[in-house]
């Protein structure tokens, strides 16, 4: 499995059977020209995870692709044919097994309303993309896409998340608003070990 980070929370996941794009949002780049996608997976409704116009253009350029998202976000794309509303606990066959986990966005602050948030476990635990949550799966994970910044997250929580999930490796994501993402990734590495 090859995973390419396209900025912020956007990942291109490629296997010998499938090409999946996760969270093509407004803080990501390089996804507009992608072709031969099998599915576009969105974790939740926030624009840094789903650029509505960009996703519509992407689907027009990838007519065989399925858009997978939660019910709330799905309402914005109800006019499209290839939309699949997913729910936690489901297992999808998108050419590769994708387990839908999670359920709720991590709390942001005070009375800021929450929203649905799906986490996606691709393959047999090869990659977990939690969206804006710190969802701990019930089985081993090879590569964890770990958020390192956001109004809902402290770096200490990211460290605890890595230590709890215990992936073989991790990929820092959700860094699009940082001025020096490498600094935060370095601090995460220092606290979690090699």
For each predicted feature, which ranges?
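Core dinuclear metal-dependent hydrolase active-site scaffold
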Residues: 1-35, 85-140, 152-157
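Hydrophobic/aromatic beta-strand patches that form the interior of the parallel beta-sheet core
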Residues: 4, 41, 68, 84, ...
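A short helix->loop->beta-strand "cap" motif at the edges of active sites that frequently abuts
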Residues: 18, 61-66, 165-169, 193
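Short, acidic/turn-prone active-site loops that include or flank metal/cofactor-
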Residues: 26-27, 45-47, 72-73, 87-91, ...
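Active-site metal-binding motif and surrounding structural segment of the metallo-beta-lactamase
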Residues: 26-69, 142-145
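Short glycine-/acidic-enriched loop or helix-start segments at secondary-structure transitions
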Residues: 31-32, 51-53, 77-80, 139-140, ...
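Portal/gating segments that form or line small-molecule/metal binding sites
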Residues: 55-106, 186-189
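Cap/insert and terminal regions of metallo-dependent hydrolase folds
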Residues: 134-194
């Amino acid at each position: 499995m090859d995973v390419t980070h396209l900025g912020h929370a956007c990942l291109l996941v490629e296997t010998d059977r499938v090409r999946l794009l996760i969270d093509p949002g407004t803080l990501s780049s390089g996804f507009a020209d992608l072709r031969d996608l099998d599915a576009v997976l969105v974790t939740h409704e926030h624009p840094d995870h789903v650029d509505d116009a960009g996703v519509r253009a992407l689907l027009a350029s990838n007519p065989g692709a399925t858009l997978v998202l939660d019910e709330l976000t799905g309402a914005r794309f109800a006019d499209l044919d290839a939309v699949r509303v997913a729910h936690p606990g489901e297992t999808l066959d998108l050419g590769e097994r994708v387990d839908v986990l999670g359920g709720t966005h991590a709390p942001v602050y005070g009375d800021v309303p929450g929203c649905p948030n799906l986490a996606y476990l691709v393959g047999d635990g090869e990659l977990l993309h939690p969206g804006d949550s710190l969802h701990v799966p019930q089985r081993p994970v090879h590569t964890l896409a770990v958020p390192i910044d956001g109004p809902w997250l402290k770096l200490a929580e990211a460290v605890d998340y890595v230590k709890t999930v215990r992936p073989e490796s991790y990929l820092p994501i959700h860094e699009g608003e940082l001025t020096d993402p490498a600094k935060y990734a370095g601090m995460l590495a220092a606290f979690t070990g090699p």
